[in-house]
Amino acid sequence: MLLVDDDSTDRELFIDAITMIGKNYEIAEAGNGEEAITFLRNTDSLPHLIILDLNMPVKDGRETLKEIKTDPILQAIPVCIMSTSSANFDVQSAYTNGANLFLVKPFEFKELIEMLSSLLSLFSKYVTLPDLAKLEK
């Protein structure tokens, strides 16, 4: 999983919630979209899910989502947008640009655990990501 949010407190909350689920998910973190794209292009193991905040410095979630969903390798990764914005424009734009889910913050901790548990279970069962070794040949 790749967690992209400029707020370190929010990232810690997500990590705590994922830890409470009880499975050993590997979690990579990025503080903005540019860090996320750099990570995705340089990793040997693509995440099964990207959790992406919309409003961040350097490269925001909107730009990052577009870049992910237009990349032939990265586009298969499900992206869950989590934002404090519930504006129809932001929600519609996210889905139009390839987001798989849009959730509005803040969450109650218990709700966050339940949501992440369902998401991770669903995406890990039904998503097959490209084999990077095959793509490089």
How would you label these PLM feature ranges?
Residues L52-D53, S83:
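Active-site residues of response regulator receiver
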Residues M56:
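Receiver (REC) domain active-site loop signature in two-component systems and cognate sites
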Residues A76-S86, A94:
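A short, hydrophobic beta-strand element within the central beta-sheet of small alpha/beta folds
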Residues N100:
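Short, glycine/charged-rich "phosphate-handling" switch motifs in NTP-dependent
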